[in-house]
Every structure is written in structure tokens, then in C-alpha cells.
């Protein structure tokens, strides 16, 4: 405080560097990959990165909703694949007329998955990471039944199946437009509604939230429903992008999505899971994946390098921040 009674905040390089670590890391990765391959920043490759980011960010927001209420959902990968498999099955069987009706039907059916997750966790009080992991095995069995345990594709899907994932509206990929819509919905819900404030309060201190009248159990249930909704959309985005469905396509992205959501808590609102941080982290993950691919790195090298980079990033933030990384309840 100065002589005039005005509070003066001291600049802390360590604090500010930690706060913007994700953005700095993103630029470092971009420069690194560009130096190895100047084609990394061509228009087409940037569009590929944005398309990959759109899927990752949508799935990361799915993880973020549950992390916000202090829980951990290990079922979002299976839920993503489940939604894509249901959509592919409905379109191939032609039980329902039109893509839109099938899309809506899938989202409605996936709410049954969310209902089971919320009941197991919020009412039977089974730790969320155990309940969702166990439930994901049920979804895996259904996925293998629908796909036959192999790549699933049908000529009956038509071009509409890949319109979202491979099409463009002008110069902008449809996937990016889809991400903007999903982000806007999440932002309005979390930042402009009472439910959003309750979700953030429930994760901060459930006991205090209950004492001030917030229905924590109900709020957590809503978080699981939102997580399943976003995981379902992410799965549909991914299958539309690739043009087919594989049994493990969602599960292969799950840990990256959870890491993105957790790393997002180190940007913008430090110590709190938030949308801007999640988007930046998802973009960084997409840049890493695309950059290693353009360098011609083998798959196992990509996994090793991604693991090392994520470990270094998380360890650095955990060490430099006094509070460490935001936590979740595992019991």
C-alpha cells in the first residue's frame, strides 16, 4: 500500500511466468516444430491442427466438468466411442430417418450412461474414478458388439457422416465451428448461470457449499450429465473426422483430455479448472501430436515424448506453485 492508501501489487516474475506457462510452452512447441519443418505453419497444416484440437478440446471440457466438482471421470473415452458407435449403428440400420434424428437419439440414449455414472457416484457414494472405470467396461462390451471389434464403416452412412469432421464452411473447418458452439454453451453455462456458480462452488469446498444451501449432490449429478454430453459430441466429432469408428478411438484420447483439463487449471484462473485454460492446453496437445507426426516420428516415440513433456510441465507447475496442482477426491 502506498502513501495514498492505494494497494500496489508487487510484480512477481515467478508467479507471472507460472501463470502464463501454458501459453509460453505452446509458443515454444510451435517454434520448435517450425524450425524442424517449415511446412508446419502452412495453411493446410494449421487447419489440421485446429481440427485435431477441436476434438481434443471438446473431450477435455467433458473431463473438466467433473474435475470442477472434485471428481475424476475415467469413462469419457468409452462414452465418446459409445456415442459414435450408436450413431453409426443407427445410420447403418436406417431405423430412424435422417442424420439429425439419429444424432438427437444418440444424445438421449447417452443420458442413460450419465444417469448410471451419477447414481453410482452421488447416491451410492462409490468413488467416481472407480465407478466410471467399472462402467466404462460395460460400454466397451457394447462397443465391441456394435463394431465387431474392428474398424466400423458403412456405405449407408452417406456423405453427411463426414460433413462435420471433414467439411468446411468457407475457409473454416466445420469442426472448429462445432468447437466454438460447444465452448460458447459451456462458457454461458459456467459463467452466466447460477448452476455454473454452484458447480464451481461444489468443487471448491463441498461442506461450505452445502451449508449455504447449494444442493451439492444434485450439482455433481448435473456435472456428470454435462460430461457425458460433451464426451458424446467429441466422439461424434472424431468419427466424422476419421470417417470410421474403431473400438478404442475414444479411450486412446482419454488421458490426453484429462491432462489438458488439469493443465488448464494453471492458466487464466490459477488453481481452478476453467475453459480458456482447457482450450490452450488442448491446443498444445494438438500441436505436439501434429508436430511429431510431421517430423515423421514413430508412434512409440510420440507417446514417449508426449509423456515426458507432460510430466515436465505438470512437475514444473506443481513445484513453482505454492498450492501445487488442483486436486480431486479419489475416495
Predicted region positions:
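Hydrophobic core segments of alpha-helical transmembrane domains in multi-pass membrane transport
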Residues: 22-34, 63, 107-110, 136-140, ...
Amino acid at each position: 500500500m502506498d502513501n495514498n492508501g492505494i494497494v500496489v501489487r508487487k510484480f512477481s516474475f515467478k508467479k507471472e511466468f507460472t501463470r502464463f506457462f501454458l501459453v509460453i510452452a505452446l509458443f515454444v512447441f510451435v517454434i520448435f516444430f517450425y524450425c524442424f519443418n517449415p511446412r508446419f505453419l502452412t495453411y493446410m497444416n494449421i487447419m489440421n491442427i485446429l481440427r485435431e484440437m477441436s476434438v481434443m478440446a471438446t473431450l477435455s471440457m467433458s473431463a473438466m466438468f467433473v474435475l470442477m466438482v472434485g471428481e475424476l471421470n475415467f469413462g469419457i473415452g468409452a462414452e465418446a466411442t459409445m456415442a459414435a458407435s450408436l450413431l453409426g449403428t443407427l445410420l447403418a440400420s436406417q431405423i430412424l430417418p435422417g442424420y439429425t434424428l439419429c444424432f438427437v437419439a444418440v444424445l438421449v440414449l447417452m443420458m442413460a450412461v450419465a444417469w448410471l455414472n451419477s447414481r453410482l457416484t452421488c447416491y451410492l457414494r462409490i468413488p467416481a474414478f472407480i465407478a466410471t472405470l467399472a462402467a466404462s467396461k460395460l460400454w466397451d462390451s457394447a462397443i465391441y458388439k456394435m463394431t465387431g471389434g474392428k474398424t466400423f464403416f458403412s456405405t449407408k452412412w452417406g456423405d453427411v457422416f463426414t460433413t462435420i469432421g471433414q467439411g468446411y464452411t468457407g475457409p473454416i473447418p466445420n469442426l472448429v465451428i462445432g468447437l466454438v458452439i460447444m465452448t460458447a454453451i459451456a462458457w454461458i453455462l459456467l459463467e452466466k448461470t447460477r448452476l455454473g456458480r454452484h458447480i464451481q462452488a461444489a468443487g471448491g469446498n463441498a461442506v461450505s457449499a452445502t451449508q449455504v444451501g447449494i444442493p451439492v449432490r444434485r450439482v455433481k449429478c448435473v456435472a456428470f450429465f454435462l460430461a457425458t454430453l460433451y464426451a458424446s459430441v467429441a466422439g461424434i466429432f472424431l468419427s466424422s473426422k476419421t470417417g470410421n469408428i474403431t473400438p478404442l478411438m475414444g479411450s486412446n484420447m482419454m488421458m490426453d483430455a484429462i491432462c489438458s483439463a488439469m493443465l488448464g487449471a494453471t492458466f487464466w484462473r490459477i488453481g481452478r479448472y476453467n475453459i480458456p485454460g482447457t482450450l490452450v492446453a488442448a491446443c498444445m496437445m494438438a500441436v505436439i501430436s501434429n508436430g511429431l507426426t510431421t517430423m515423421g516420428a514413430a508412434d512409440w516415440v510420440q507417446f514417449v515424448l508426449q509423456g515426458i513433456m507432460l510430466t515436465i510441465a505438470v512437475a514444473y507447475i506443481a513445484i513453482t506453485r505454492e498450492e501445487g496442482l488442483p486436486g480431486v477426491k479419489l475416495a
